């Protein structure tokens, strides 16, 4: 039962619905606000109610496939009775009411579980169920301002700028669907459901776009990560560049310099790299650009992408959703699917976030408002109530139930609660960020995670720039270099201490093995025989080159689930493309939608959204496959194309592109329909606050807050449409008011009046936040190498079994466990692996050179 509105909760409901769940969407009178939150589509010529904007909004059409709609008002007796009846039938409830609303009506979690001990309730709210900000309102920009690194996104001489559309809320939806599926699996295994408290603020602080790395960097003496005017201060090109017909994003790490040189084919430039100190050559950056610019502008973006990618250099075209609908790669993968809607008519939309046989299907389009009332009420009338009517419970039901003995479970009771993935062993061959984030989630949910690390092949950007990067280079790069404790890499084991690695490394064990050797390959396959899942996100050809492709894995262990998280999928023209998350965000439409509305794409700072979205999405995919294996007894290959999962976060733009052909331009911090929304200057140096008015009531309240009540009836601002048309005037009015106040003054004055607002947080603000402190958000974590520091805890809280919080793994820390306990090797055989060079805890020999 989906009682959630807007984006995050409905996105979680869509994930469950599209993979087979029956989802009933309970809408408030007038409908879910997302019916008015995105591009408005033209009506089908045959539509009788085509003038109704609520049925033609691309955002709602995207978020609500495979759902049925019924309208019920929880504030009326009849509506409350209908909702109570629906909750009687539910396995899972997704809700986003202001905390306390369900409890006030006798429909809180404790009341519901008295009637159904297995019920899972997910409360997805801006700030969680408890804490000083629990009653405060949210929006996509609110979540990013406080939880994401909005402070460091954009240009240093401009205001911070949010990501495009609703991608932050969609990523929260990815996290929520993972939590929901995990909780439901626990309920099936133990008979005990749980209540999930998911704070959008916390989910973002724990995951989005290098936020955890920046928080560690601040603790390690690195200061605040600020906005940068350009990435071109670096020696190697990592920025957006113009071509003959558009733009490309080029990302270059030191290990890829030879690839770049092969493409540019300039002997004089290549000779400059013969010096061991080329990274410190102040003039080299300008000389590279002098060769790069002419090469780019003499060709088109597609050709330059193909040429660079042929040499494995991470150059990708900047595409819009319009560019992609008929792109050869997505046509070849049959990614886009067509849905016929009674008002909008046939339209193409994004396809599955991952491929798992026939698990994903669009069975019906998004519903019309209250479309299924009669059939849903008929089903309720036919159902026999299992218990007394919850609607008759008084407002103290939750408190009374909380003090009473636990109800008896009704399915497969166990002696003690257990996490859903306890007893599941997962081989982790992941790199960089997306894959490690996926296995981190799975470890949190109870799985044993065994990293298989090759000590002879250092993974750049996974455990650092290099095994022992120069400390002066790290000082120059700051948090962008991945962050190290006190910038110390000259001693110790820096491959165990890099911030980006540490951020995703809890609950994992590491063994070392050179799979390139016959002995190493055989030992790896023996581990496969003893495991349930393999997760990897290397280049597509890697497993086959190692002789451990899917056919080999499946033959050795038919029950194995393999989740392969290639950025562009396992087949298609772009499947072999290399890059980081930002590379594929440009290629697949997201980057074209974000940025300042008055500047060209070369002003964009590099952002990474695809990685955290893939982490939560990949964990959901693995659990889906494990559930299928429980039914069939056979494992499956998951083709998790990170780009296709991410494209679902901007799905409304693909629907609009298909129906209208419109290429959407960046709109900065504004909202496509609501107004005003923006980021405004405050008292202090580089201090900012965001305000996001969603309706006329909030606008009227804001007018009173700023002491200009007469503006509420001013014809220029009285309606949403008028405010959009006069947004520049509103921005000036609000900036004049905010500039005399601190960000927190703006935050509290607006929120206490019912107006969504937030300070734009830097790292120091996050650690000083009283709400996060009250909810125990930061917890101590570490290892012998990294020491003990404060890390964000899990992405959600729940009343189920305690999520795991194990130490950060170190290279080879579980060698004895894996080879002796899991594989059963004798002491003599283990010693032989040491002598053969498989077993180690370092990427370097004693003299400091690589193995």
Task: List the predicted regions and their residue ranges.
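Mid-domain beta-loop-alpha active-site segment that forms a flexible
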Residues: 142, 164-181, 200-211, 252-259, ...
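Short Gly/Pro-enriched turn/cap motifs at secondary-structure boundaries
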Residues: 51-52, 60, 226-233, 238-239, ...
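Oxidoreductase and adenylate-handling cofactor-binding alpha/beta cores
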Residues: 147, 173-194, 206, 210-219, ...
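Short, well-structured beta-strand/strand-turn elements
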Residues: 22-23, 309-323, 383-385, 449, ...
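N-terminal helix-loop segment corresponding to the beta1-alpha1 unit
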Residues: 1-189, 368, 372-631, 810, ...
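Aromatic-enriched alpha-helical interface/lid elements that frame and gate functional surfaces
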Residues: 237-311, 315, 322, 328, ...
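Conserved Rossmann-fold dehydrogenase catalytic segment
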Residues: 157-167, 188-204, 228-231, 570, ...
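A glycine-rich dinucleotide-binding beta-alpha-beta segment and adjacent secondary-structure elements
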Residues: 311-363, 752-805
